[in-house]
């Protein structure tokens, strides 16, 4: 069987480290709007994520398709950004589904990005694939995020790909050492003395170490009994104040100033982002992965943060 994996969104934060790690086991083809001639062993192919073209040939006989495309949500949700966030997810998913449907030899599996934010804001309930409740909560101001997540998965579900199983990666915050991710932001805040609890710090944070994310992706490619939504998250979500305590300890910072909700709202406005990213309580667990025997190398945040800090 071919070892070619086609990766859309391979130049973003998650795609960049994913392609590096899985390139040991697969031949990677990255679909990108701006191909580079020199990218090691990775092949880059041009696409515009809106129309069919020569790039569709890469799907014929491929082992898998992974779609991580989508504009970053780390921005203010004004009208233009809302449109870009939604379209960049829905349209890439739509055109990839159309390409698979037309393929002479379609890939047997399609992993499409989604988000753990699809679940309701909750403090006291674990959200898994079978019993998790989907929907917006006014307290968390997450209506737009839920709208995007549902439209994203609906587009995936509507794609007619009978020979290709489809998996929606409901991914939590990915902790990684590279620039551009949430961990480096939290680390910087901690070193500035701002790594305290936010809005009380009781909201749960769902997260996953970058290595476990990549291993889960490979697992889902190779285990063909998976289909539909899969939570890609550590089995141990923790309160935000506990997360910051761990980061402070590993960074050698003795204290962190707390922030109220209104302070967070002001800071989010100044930094051109949304407070929802921190306020919402996400208590997501990966029941399907655990039931199938997937072993997390970093199930506890203490170990995940320590491993990342050892590389920084």
Feature map (PLM): residue ranges:
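Active-site Tyr-X1-5-Lys
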Residues: 137-166
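Mid/C-terminal beta-alpha module of Rossmann-like enzyme folds, strongest
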Residues: 220-272, 306-312
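Conserved Rossmann-fold NAD(P)-dependent oxidoreductase catalytic core, especially the SDR/UDP-sugar
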Residues: 94-142
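N-terminal Rossmann NAD(P)H-binding glycine-rich loop of SDR-like oxidoreductase domains
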Residues: 5-23
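C-terminal amphipathic/interface module of NAD(P)-dependent oxidoreductases
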Residues: 3, 254-255, 276-312
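Alpha-helical substrate-binding/gating segment
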Residues: 187-196, 202-237
């Amino acid at each position: 069987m071919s070892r070619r994996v086609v990766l859309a969104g391979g130049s973003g934060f998650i795609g960049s480290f994913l392609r590096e790690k899985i390139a040991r086991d697969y031949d990677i083809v990255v679909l990108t709007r701006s191909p580079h001639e020199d990218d090691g062993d990775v092949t880059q192919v041009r696409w515009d994520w809106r129309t069919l073209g020569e790039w569709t040939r890469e799907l014929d006989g491929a082992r898998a398709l992974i779609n991580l495309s989508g504009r970053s949500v780390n921005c203010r949700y004004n009208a233009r950004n809302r449109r870009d966030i939604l379209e960049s997810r829905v349209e890439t998913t739509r055109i990839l589904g159309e390409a698979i449907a037309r393929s002479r030899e379609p890939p047997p599996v399609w992993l499409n990005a989604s988000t753990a934010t699809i679940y309701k804001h909750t403090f006291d309930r674990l959200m898994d694939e079978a019993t998790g409740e989907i929907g917006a909560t006014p307290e968390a101001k997450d209506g737009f995020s839920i709208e995007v997540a549902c439209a994203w998965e609906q587009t995936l579900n509507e794609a007619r790909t009978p020979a290709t199983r489809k998996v929606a990666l409901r991914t939590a915050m990915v902790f990684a050492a590279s620039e551009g991710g949430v961990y480096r932001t939290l680390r910087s805040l901690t070193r500035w003395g701002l790594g305290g609890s936010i809005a009380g710090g009781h909201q749960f944070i769902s997260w996953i170490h970058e290595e476990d994310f990549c291993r889960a992706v490979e697992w889902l490619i190779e285990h063909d009994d998976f289909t539909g939504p899969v939570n890609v998250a550590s089995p141990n979500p923790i309160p935000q104040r506990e997360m910051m305590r761990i980061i402070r300890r590993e960074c050698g910072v003795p204290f962190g100033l707390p922030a109220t909700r209104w302070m967070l709202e002001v800071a989010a406005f100044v930094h051109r982002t949304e407070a929802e990213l921190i306020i919402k309580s996400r208590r997501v667990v990966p029941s399907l992965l655990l039931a199938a025997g997937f072993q997390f190398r970093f199930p506890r945040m203490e170990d995940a943060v320590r491993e990342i800090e050892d590389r920084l």
